[in-house]
UniProtKB/Swiss-Prot annotation:
UniProt-recorded name of the protein: Small ribosomal subunit protein eS27
Cystine crosslinks: none
Organism: Thermococcus gammatolerans (strain DSM 15229 / JCM 11827 / EJ3)
Gene Ontology terms, MF aspect: structural constituent of ribosome; zinc ion binding
The encoding gene: rps27e
GO cellular-component term (any): ribonucleoprotein complex
Segments forming C4-type zinc fingers: 20-42
Amino acid sequence: MALPKNLIPMPRSRFLRVKCIDCGNEQIVFSHPATKVRCLVCGATLVEPTGGKGVIKAKILEVLE
């Protein structure tokens, strides 16, 4: 009997480096947020929760591991 490659599955959630569309501020956010994530500079909404993966309203620059 063959063993599966990953005995411990990796999480599907990630941290993302995003750039605010309004002011250009770069910020690190979670991909599955429980609350609204706002820009620290201008207050614009960057990510909205949906009960799972959030709706990202900013430009994704990098996916952090």
